[in-house]
Amino acid sequence: MSKHLRGVKPQITADREPLVKAPRPPSFFGPLALAEWKRIMPVLIGRRVICAADLGQIETYCVMAGLVREIETQRQLAGGVIDGRLFGVQNRAAQTARQIAATLGLDPVSRARIATGGDDAPDDDDPLAV
């Protein structure tokens, strides 16, 4: 099993051809997915870590995050009743959104990886270093 399948992620670095301006959001987005797009795109553009090839992944993240919120809103409007089928859909959408967020640097651990230069940063105070 390769180390990349065990959850070890490569260092996030600036892209060679990063987007410098957020493209228009897809027309099929619902209001919650659109709100997520508007929230994350300035952050991702500012970090210079995404290119045009990443837009499909970002679209999927926004749709999944919007779906999680939409199902939660429906649950609250139904008086807090939990529909087992919708809970399963919400759970899978949340998992997908969380996984994509980690690859895009949108969670605390991946942001720390960006700030520190990755997991392979040398440790200057290693007592065993010669």
Language-model segments: which ranges?
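Preference for short coil/turn "hinge" residues that link or interrupt alpha-helices
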Residues: 22, 42-48, 99, 121
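An amphipathic, hydrophobic-aromatic interaction surface with interspersed Lys/Arg
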Residues: 26-78
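Generic N-terminal initiation segments characterized by hydrophobic and/or small/turn-forming residues
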Residues: 2, 16, 52, 83, ...
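Arg/Lys-rich, low-complexity, intrinsically disordered N-terminal tails that contact nucleic acids
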Residues: 1-38, 110-130
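Aromatic-residue detector
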Residues: 45-48, 90, 109, 127-129
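Amphipathic alpha-helical protein-protein interaction segments
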Residues: 59-64, 68, 75-120
